[in-house]
Amino acid sequence: MIPVIIGIVVVVVIVCAIAGIYNNMVTKRNRIDNAWQNIDTQLQRRNDLIPNLVETVKGYAKHEQDTLAAVVNARNAAVSATTPEAKMEADNVLTDALRQLFAVAEAYPDLKANTNFMQLQATLEDTENKVSYARQSYNDCVLSYNNAIQTFPAVIFAGIFQFKERQGFEAAEAARQAPTVKF
């Protein structure tokens, strides 16, 4: 009788341990999905601001059609991207295009003094800060999840339960390079 009870207790402990490992991996995966939704929300907010910014700049920078077209095209690509990987890539392209647009705006003092432009620029900067924070949160969640599924004993069950490694959000190549300062 005692060996049966010990056997039942051992089985219950093993099942509870596996359930705990599984629940931990599910929780971490769900945190990644939630963090991605936070990024997506901020990217959508930024995408909604861009048409107003482009219209404001058009009136002042008539000779900068290539830059404006690059921003519009990058925004359209970002809006139409469907997978997280495609959105990450499109976001990097859009961030670079916006950086170029604001560099062009420096050459137009009247544009820089325009109240609407200043408000849009401030709102975009605020949104960029929120996107940056959301990316950091996402990457933290991805790191925690990847560590969880790659360490023992969870690594044994991660494959069985189809938990796959996730990729973090990487900065665009242009963002990695230090800006050139000339005096």
Language model features: what each stretch is:
Residues 1-183:
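A helix-centric hydrophobic-segment signal that preferentially recognizes long
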